[in-house]
């Protein structure tokens, strides 16, 4: 019972870790270091493997991510004695879209896998940085060693790992015909977030999906200070920031990917001399 109370329930007795505290920064440092080393090592070693072999790594990352997400949801439901907390855990945040995008990139077929791979490459690092480093709400409430803080860290870092691995292994394609689809995926989840926030606003479980109602210590805090929480200008600014990231990061990823492909297919000048 002690283990359950301290590490899984909301009736813990430990002190909150604190946002950007030593414990928070230590967890971030270890998580980012491990994810980066793994992504670089596996990405370089599998760069010239088949697409199927490259996607095997994404499958492990997807299972890892979903395991901890499911564990946290299960703990919340058991603690509440009700499945109602699941309403707060739908994948309608920019970072938790990865709970859908990463498995589809890993296990999907043909164009679905290709488009979702591009999506993860664009948004994975943003999820890792903004979601784990900017998780003020989580670390202000829960101890460093709690399912909520650990799930937040591990699932976000897994997204960053997946994005780095995709870049390094040259798994993404960034085809022009897929651009409208990646934009459509983001737009669809935004619509779902707005609908969910509106439908659950007057219930005991009001949601703040996509942080459209208020910030959570993420970079959107600047918009909240400028326009105020629950305002239309705040919500629009938050949405525009996501679209801006999609445009800038997508263009950069596409350029780097095409440059890498060109370098691989260009003949060596030394061979030409021979």
Description of each model-found segment:
Residues 104-162:
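Membrane-proximal helix-loop-helix units in multi-pass membrane proteins
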Residues 1-56:
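N-terminal topogenic module of multi-pass integral membrane proteins
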Residues 27-31, 83-96, 120-122:
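Structural signature of hydrophobic alpha-helical transmembrane segments
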């Amino acid at each position: 019972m002690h283990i359950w109370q301290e590490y899984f329930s909301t009736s813990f007795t430990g002190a909150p870790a604190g946002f950007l505290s030593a414990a928070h920064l230590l967890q971030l440092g270890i998580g980012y270091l491990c994810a980066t080393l793994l992504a670089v090592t596996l990405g370089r070693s599998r760069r010239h493997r088949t697409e199927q072999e490259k996607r095997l790594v994404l499958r492990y990352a997807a299972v890892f991510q979903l395991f901890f997400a499911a564990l946290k949801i299960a703990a919340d439901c058991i603690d509440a004695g009700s499945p109602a907390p699941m309403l707060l855990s739908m994948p309608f945040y920019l970072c938790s879209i990865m709970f859908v995008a990463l498995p589809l990139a890993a296990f999907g077929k043909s164009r679905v896998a290709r488009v979702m791979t591009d999506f993860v490459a664009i948004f994975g690092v943003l999820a890792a940085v903004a979601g784990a480093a900017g998780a003020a709400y989580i670390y202000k409430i829960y101890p460093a060693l709690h399912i909520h803080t650990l799930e937040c860290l591990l699932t976000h870092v897994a997204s960053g790992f997946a994005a780095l691995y995709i870049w390094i292994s040259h798994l993404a394609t960034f085809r022009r015909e897929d651009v409208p689809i990646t934009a459509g995926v983001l737009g669809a989840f935004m619509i779902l977030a707005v609908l969910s926030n509106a439908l659950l606003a007057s219930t005991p479980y009001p949601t703040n999906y996509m942080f459209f109602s208020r910030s959570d210590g993420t970079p959107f805090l600047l918009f909240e200070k400028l326009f105020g929480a629950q305002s239309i200008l705040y919500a629009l600014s938050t949405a525009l920031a996501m679209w801006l990231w999609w445009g800038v990061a997508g263009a950069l990823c596409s350029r780097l990917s095409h440059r890498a492909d060109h370098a691989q297919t260009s003949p060596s000048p030394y061979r030409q001399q021979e």
